UniProtKB/Swiss-Prot annotation:
Annotated stretches, region: Disordered: 370-406
Protein's UniProt name: Uncharacterized protein C895.08c
Cytoplasm in keyword set: yes
Keyword Nucleus among record annotations: yes
Subcellular localization, as worded in the UniProt entry: Cytoplasm; Nucleus
Organism: Schizosaccharomyces pombe (strain 972 / ATCC 24843) (Fission yeast)
Lineage: Eukaryota, Fungi, Dikarya, Ascomycota, Taphrinomycotina
Main location: cytoplasm
Length: 490
């Protein structure tokens, strides 16, 4: 977090919520903070959220229209002291008529959040600051036909992409530049593009020993540098060779050219994983966490040339069976992250390392430490077995109490979960990502039923517990959950 002084910092995003299961709602959640080097008297501090529609016209300037004004009074008549950390929360539900952020040739819809500070004293603090706000989904079901089936997310334009730069802990001379949409829509055919650029700050990116050219894959041939020099050596040596000293000339040629030919540009293997973390908040301030690897892929980077970027592109599928990001449910927290690691050689697949034995024969990219027993077919990952192939099959499976009962889940190994946690923490980079679903009211149906007496995800961690005790909670339990206090205040 940036704690630089004499600057108004604004952090946050638009998140979905389960305030009411039957009615979709999204929350604007931002935090304003600042630290000053002066002491002054602030008359008032305000914040405003404004939407802007732009339509092209025959004139040079487009037609602009402001809408969806939300105002906050953050403070009045208070003294700002030097070196004190001031923070203010900006929280409010968006109106149902809020359209999504979109940029097209026929017009655009954008939003911004503005914070204004008014004082009559001399100070270094700016009087205003604003940030763009991306609304990734539409909340107007009356305007869109059949909106109960699908709500399109944010378009993948440059304004929706987040750019990050990080240094590798394993290779200190490498800097990785990431570009990806931090807010992404999930559904049939939806993907999350991830662009990774590697840049070497060390001039010594070459290898002069065989087998250490940045890759041990025999199918990948590193590119030799100084090819013109080696060709010149060949042309310069060959006329001087004679039949009498043919062998001597060949050995001399080999000794002379080998140091040049063996210097190769390094390549690195980049592995990407999409990981889902589900946390159940239990009673007595206890919680339990589940981590599932949803996607795994890896590619070799192009040869890294000093001073240039070596780009690797990944396309991560985000299907509708993946849970949407959830941060407002009082008993449930769903988060997603993209883990990236850099290797000098191709590592073995995660499914063969950490997955249970019955999953190691599967070649699917999605692996989970949870699985469901089926009498007609072998066990598979949680994403493929619990959710089913389509949303209709999910509803049919949950409609049957016998299929949705807790004993259908197979034994969960705490040892595997601990190994997976430790292994993910050892990776080089962790990128946060927020996934939004089509229907907020159906998201909870993707999860097993929650019970205050039996945690459907984590009861299997208790080896001494009675695994045959079914859960008495129904999916309607979530509809009676009261919203958080800050939503009532808003």
């Amino acid at each position: 977090m940036d704690n630089s002084r004499d600057k108004i910092h604004i952090l946050g995003a638009v998140s979905d919520t389960f305030q009411e299961v039957q009615h979709p709602c999204s929350i604007l959640k931002y935090k304003v903070y600042f630290v000053t080097t002066d002491t002054f008297y602030c008359k008032y501090l305000t914040a405003s959220f404004t939407g802007l529609k732009k339509f092209p016209t025959e004139r040079q300037l487009p037609l602009e229209c402001h809408f969806n004004h939300i105002d906050w009074d953050l403070g009045n008549n208070f003294k700002v002291k030097e070196g004190v950390f001031y923070t203010f929360d900006i929280i409010a539900p968006l109106p149902r008529c809020t359209p999504r952020t979109i940029v097209t040739q026929e017009g655009s819809i954008s939003y911004k959040l503005t914070v204004k500070l008014y004082t009559e004293d001399d100070c270094r603090m700016p009087k205003s600051a604003n940030v763009p706000v991306v609304v990734p989904f539409t909340l107007n079901p009356d305007r869109i036909p059949e909106s109960q089936h699908i709500r399109y997310g944010a378009p993948l334009n440059d304004a929706c992409f987040t750019s990050l730069s990080m240094k590798s802990s394993k290779y200190s001379f490498l800097t990785a530049f990431f570009k990806y949409p931090q807010q992404c829509y999930k559904g049939p055919g939806c993907v999350c593009p991830l662009l990774i650029d590697l840049e070497s700050e060390d001039a010594d990116v070459l290898s002069s020993t065989p087998g250490s050219a940045g890759t041990d894959d025999p199918h990948i041939d590193p590119i030799a540098i100084n090819s013109q020099d080696s060709q010149f050596i060949f042309q310069d040596r060959l006329p001087r060779l004679s039949n009498d000293c043919d062998m001597k000339g060949r050995s001399s040629l080999s000794r002379t050219s080998s140091p040049v030919v063996e210097k190769k540009l390094k390549r690195y293997y980049i592995r990407v994983l999409l990981v889902q973390s589900i946390t159940f908040f239990l009673f007595n301030d206890a919680f339990r966490n589940s981590i599932t690897v949803l996607f795994e892929d890896g590619k070799w980077s192009p040869p890294i040339v000093p001073g240039l970027h070596s780009r690797v592109e990944f396309t991560i599928p985000v299907n509708d069976l993946i849970h949407g990001s959830c941060t407002e449910n009082p008993h449930l927290l769903v988060r997603h992250s993209i883990y990236v690691s850099i290797h000098s050689r191709e590592p073995s697949s995660l499914s063969r390392k950490l997955a249970p034995p019955f999953l190691r024969t599967h070649k699917a990219k999605s692996n989970s430490l949870f699985s469901m027993k089926r009498p007609s077919s072998s066990s598979s990952s949680l994403s493929g077995s619990w959710h089913g192939d389509t949303e209709n099959s999910v509803k049919q499976s949950l409609a049957s109490p016998s299929e949705a009962s807790l004993p259908n889940l197979s034994k969960y190994s705490r040892k595997n979960a601990k190994k997976l946690n430790e292994w993910l923490d050892s990776l080089d980079f962790k990128l946060p990502i927020y996934l939004f679903h089509r229907k907020l009211e159906s998201e909870l149906s993707h999860l097993p039923p929650y019970s205050p007496y039996r945690d459907s995800y984590f009861y299997l961690e208790d080896d001494d517990g009675d695994a045959d005790t079914p859960s008495t909670a129904s999916l309607d339990y979530f509809s009676n959950i009261s919203p958080p206090d800050f939503l009532n205040k808003a």
